Amino acid sequence: MSSIKVMNEILANKINAGEVVEKCVSIVKELVENSIDAGSDDIKIYLKESGLKEIKVIDNGIGMDKEDAILAFQRHATSKLLKEDDLFNINTLGFRGEALPSIAVISEVVLKTTKDNVSTLIHIKGGKLLENTSCEARSGTTITVSNIFYNTPARLKYLKSPYSELANIVDYINKIALSYPNIKFKLVNDDKEL
């Protein structure tokens, strides 16, 4: 009998998520880059306990319709690559379709997005869809990530102190803000603007 087995999808997704999402700054980076790729010129990042408790990113980008909002949480689903030749002309920060599914499998995510005056709410916890409905929302996208690594305790123990997590996020936001001077960034931790 073979000792090598194919992992079930949930376990494989949790392991894969650990490659994309290592700490709080990884989540902030992926969400901010999605906002930039969506054409945002105003991005707000709100943290609770340096991102250890909650990360919320609000943008004024193009938003998503209901179909795209749910597809965004499927692995390898992307609006940025359609064919192999596109790999030679990547003009976006993200393109693999890995970030949102990876974040959603190790946390709880609430996405509110509006496109063409139609707003959608997606609620996912541990990779399981809990809610997919219409809602009231402002234009653009608001995504809230909480309970980070709640179901992967091995990863949870590798998170740094709140001070270290915050320092990494501040460093990333400073660098991305310098790279995109036409975008207004706002970073708030525990109601204190940084």
Segments predicted by a language model, with ranges:
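N-terminal phosphate-binding caps/lids of nucleotide- and nucleic-acid-binding domains
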Residues: 2-194
